[in-house]
Amino acid sequence: MAVSVIILAAGQGTRMHSTLPKVLHQLAGRPLLSHVIATARQLNPAQIIVVYGHGGETVPEAFRAADITWVRQELQLGTGHAALQTLPYIKPDTMLLILSGDVPLVKIETLKRLLAMVDQGGVGLLTVELANPNGYGRIIRDRVGGVSKIIEEADASPEQRRIREVNTGITAIEARYLKQIAPKLSNNNAQGEYYLTDIIEHAVASGEKVVAVSAADSIEVMGVNDRQQLAYLERFYQKREAARLMGEGVSLSDPDRFDLRGELLVGKDVYIDINVILEGRVILGDGVKIGPHCYLRNAVLGEGVEVLANCVIEEAAIDACARVGPFTRIRPETRLGEGVHIGNFVEIKKSTINKNSKVNHLSYIGDATIGKKVNIGAGTITCNYDGANKHHTLIEDNVFIGSDTQLIAPVKIGAGATIGAGATITHDVPPGELTLSRTPQKSWPGWKRPSKK
């Protein structure tokens, strides 16, 4: 039977104490809802429907995904009410898999196991046993162990509250049965809400097959209700990813001080030091070494690249055996060629620096193309902005630029040219020539420093 996924994401999240909708709070650099959608897509469903409410259009606007149907729940009247809002949109003859937008770590294998149990029809629910079940709806079973109903904690008796098997909120139900049961749902309970869990009791009463599948690990069905729970899941996720990477041959100096906030593809013998943050899509070739306190976002590093401490690399590509840092910032649209050295307190923006060139100290290179075997002295600035527009600097192969040089773009430095220290270059420099632009040095014999009176 084809699957339609419904994700309930309309909750207010009052315990987050935030103006941001709860499902947009981030886990590992992505909204909670993004994790759930990504898992749902692995099922290749006939459709994905997201029910949103609190926060209004900020939720769908954060995704703009063509494969998602967005349904707004104007009034938050419970999970049952939220599910019923999808009735005009769901495809007939499908199995509905109802997920929670604030349960980000549920495993695809668990969902497939649940769906397999109801493939021929009926109602399925995912349960879990908790040492401390406070706050969860309890699973009530009959004398032969079958599920008879789910009772929310607010409506449970003291005896029922001692039950440790709880409802996770993840439910599988045929579309035709949800439509059939919809008129029977009631808000006659302590919360005055329409509970999705009431479906179970109605299903049992009408003779529908009801099955329960137990999650192997409580962490995968843990929801986020406050910032402490979010932080707990964040640490769990990061430790899990760290263990996976070490299993693939990555050396982590301290797995507890590593943050992956996206996708990481790695070669062999990669070393990552403490407090490194990787965001977006990062590719690290064989033998890459990342020093402590570095931030990489959407970066590609070739074989043998070394990044020293305290570097920021964003939207950039670095070829084999290059070295960057410490305290270097590589900004978007930058490419560093093989064997390039970028040193301390250097900023590179929207530039290409070719093989074996060096910018070792205290420089800004922006909107520039630099050839091979170029040496850029300390304090060199490409002056690329005239107050209105950005301009390009071209430095050809084998150029030597002395310290404290300003290159006023647009400008071209010919191959093999040498520029003396302290120059301000406003015109193109011919190939192979020495260019100076300083005022002559003068000394005043007999001059004395003023003394204090």
Swiss-Prot record:
Its cofactor is Mg(2+). Pathway: Nucleotide-sugar biosynthesis; UDP-N-acetyl-alpha-D-glucosamine biosynthesis; N-acetyl-alpha-D-glucosamine 1-phosphate from alpha-D-glucosamine 6-phosphate (route II): step 2/2; Nucleotide-sugar biosynthesis; UDP-N-acetyl-alpha-D-glucosamine biosynthesis; UDP-N-acetyl-alpha-D-glucosamine from N-acetyl-alpha-D-glucosamine 1-phosphate: step 1/1; Bacterial outer membrane biogenesis; LPS lipid A biosynthesis. Residues 1-227 are annotated as: Pyrophosphorylase. Residues 228-248 are annotated as: Linker. Mg(2+) binds at residues 102, 225. Pfam families: Hexapep (PF00132), NTP_transf_3 (PF12804). Keywords: Acyltransferase, Cell shape, Cell wall biogenesis/degradation, Cytoplasm, Magnesium, Metal-binding, Multifunctional enzyme, Nucleotidyltransferase, Peptidoglycan synthesis, Repeat, Transferase. It comes from the Bacteria. UDP-N-acetyl-alpha-D-glucosamine binds at residues 8-11, 22, 73, 78-79, 100-102, 137, 152, 167, 225, 331, 349, 364, 375. It is found in: Cytoplasm. InterPro entries: Bifunctional_GlmU, GlmU-like, GlmU_C_LbH, Hexapep, Hexapep_transf_CS, MobA-like_NTP_Trfase, Nucleotide-diphossugar_trans, Trimer_LpxA-like_sf. GO terms for molecular function: glucosamine-1-phosphate N-acetyltransferase activity; magnesium ion binding; UDP-N-acetylglucosamine diphosphorylase activity. CDD domains: GT2_GlmU_N_bac (cd02540), LbH_GlmU_C (cd03353). The keyword Magnesium applies. Residues 249-453 are annotated as: N-acetyltransferase. GO terms for biological process: cell morphogenesis; cell wall organization; lipid A biosynthetic process; peptidoglycan biosynthetic process; regulation of cell shape; UDP-N-acetylglucosamine biosynthetic process. Its EC number is 2.7.7.23, 2.3.1.157. Catalyzes the last two sequential reactions in the de novo biosynthetic pathway for UDP-N-acetylglucosamine (UDP-GlcNAc). The C-terminal domain catalyzes the transfer of acetyl group from acetyl coenzyme A to glucosamine-1-phosphate (GlcN-1-P) to produce N-acetylglucosamine-1-phosphate (GlcNAc-1-P), which is converted into UDP-GlcNAc by the transfer of uridine 5-monophosphate (from uridine 5-triphosphate), a reaction catalyzed by the N-terminal domain. This is Bifunctional protein GlmU.
